[in-house]
């Protein structure tokens, strides 16, 4: 295992964060992002999920149709778990995004799973998924895979096996 690498990122959105690559394995790695300055807070269903001091710990797993992120507040308390449903995560090399020699990428398939702390997980953005199919951004087959992946994530989160 290599020591964690750090990179501080800044966007045109008035947002800064620091990413540490915690652990690197052949088929996955775990990142830990801590938010710095922000022009506005990010929320899901009126629950703040990103503000200065909040951390997103993300598991990127090659070949999976999802990326799971645990969200912690500035005290380290669990706020919730957010999951992007996506094309199969694939390994890429020489990425500057995470400050590591290797990384993973995916294509977002519009559907997400959200689990607030101590509650059951549920789907987000089903309407966006259907719009994406209707507009030709993704295929009906990809949408079906997305729904299957979301069901799998809900099962995983429901069993707390992440």
Residue ranges and their predicted role:
Residues 109-152:
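A hydrophobic, small-residue-rich beta->alpha segment in the mid-to-C-terminal subdomain
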Residues 29, 78-79, 121:
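Hydrophobic residues embedded in beta-strands of well-ordered beta-sheets
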Residues 148-162:
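Cysteine/selenocysteine-centered motifs that mediate thiol-based redox chemistry or coordinate metal-sulfur cofactors
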Residues 1-52:
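Charge-rich, low-complexity N-terminal segments
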Residues 25, 74-75, 116-120:
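Short acidic-glycine loop/turn motifs at beta-strand connectors
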Residues 49, 57-108:
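Structured beta-strand/loop patches that form or line metal/cofactor-binding pockets in enzymes
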Residues 16-17, 108-110:
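Short beta-strand-initiation
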Residues 35, 85-89, 117:
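Generic secondary-structure microfeatures
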